[in-house]
């Protein structure tokens, strides 16, 4: 299994979607993550694991913590933690719709899509 995600450092794609998932209480998380791993190529789909998810799996990662919120005069930078973040990257908008549906089906029963942010270049 390749653990690198080259999409993180790649150029900005023409279209993207950021999907933020909430872990469902009492759900079997590990099997859903294994299904997700099979879809993740690190280029078209980049995955980020939140601190709450990592801790619920009993596998803490040194240095991993929730992003703090900041407030400066005229500027708020909120903290928007999620259990799981998926960054979909594509040159076609239609691909993102299909990928989003596939991810929701793959993670069903363990995660719920909480927020989606679409982006374009």
Regions found by a protein language model. Give the residues of each.
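Long, low-complexity, Ser/Thr/Gly/Pro-rich intrinsically disordered segments that act as flexible linkers
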Residues: 1-121
